[in-house]
Amino acid sequence: MIVGIGNDLVEIQRLTNMLNKGHGQRFLERCFTQQEQQLCNGRSTPQRACCYAKRFAAKEAVIKALGVGFRQGLWFTDIEVLPNQLGRPTVTLHGATAQWLACHHPGQVNIHLSLSDEKGLAIATALIECHPLAMAPS
């Protein structure tokens, strides 16, 4: 069963500006996990903002796919976007976001994610599917 589909578009220059301002570190700590920060900070200067922009777009896309928005105690850092061994972007949910999904959609959940960038824009599309737990025989 499809839980939802979400997408988001982020202007990379906007993230560059945020990172270069005095509150850039606070923004990173509020929106990205330590592992995400390590990944993006390891990139060259031009690619650093793009890395963050893709992950920010991905987090927004996942929240849109959940259909709840950032409320009910859900945080950006509850959604972690990292590459797997082959470089494919994967989503791991933590905290209240993971609890909300498990409560409202029990079963095996798969989050499919696509990230891209072109001409100063980063885009993410997320599709969340849930295979409900089999009902126990009566």
UniProtKB/Swiss-Prot annotation:
Natural source organism? Magnetococcus marinus (strain ATCC BAA-1437 / JCM 17883 / MC-1)
Q: Per its record, how is this protein called by name?
A: Holo-[acyl-carrier-protein] synthase
Identify the domain of life.
Bacteria
The reply to whether Cytoplasm figures as a keyword in the UniProt entry is yes
Q: Which UniProt keywords apply?
A: Cytoplasm, Fatty acid biosynthesis, Fatty acid metabolism, Lipid biosynthesis, Lipid metabolism, Magnesium, Metal-binding, Transferase
Query: Where is it localised?
Result: Cytoplasm
* Function, in words: Transfers the 4'-phosphopantetheine moiety from coenzyme A to a Ser of acyl-carrier-protein.
**Homology family:** Belongs to the P-Pant transferase superfamily. AcpS family.
Quote one Gene Ontology molecular function term: holo-[acyl-carrier-protein] synthase activity
Q: Which Pfam families match?
A: ACPS (PF01648)
InterPro entries, per this entry?
A: 4-PPantetheinyl_Trfase_dom, 4-PPantetheinyl_Trfase_dom_sf, ACPS, Ppantetheine-prot_Trfase_dom
Kindly give the HAMAP family that the UniProt entry links to this protein.
AcpS (MF_00101)
Q: Where are the transmembrane segments?
A: none
Q: What is its main location?
A: cytoplasm
GO cellular component term of the entry, any? cytoplasm
Cofactors demanded by this protein = Mg(2+)
Enumerate the catalysed reactions. apo-[ACP] + CoA = holo-[ACP] + adenosine 3',5'-bisphosphate + H(+)
Keyword Cytoplasm among UniProt keywords: yes
Q: What class of enzyme is it?
A: transferase
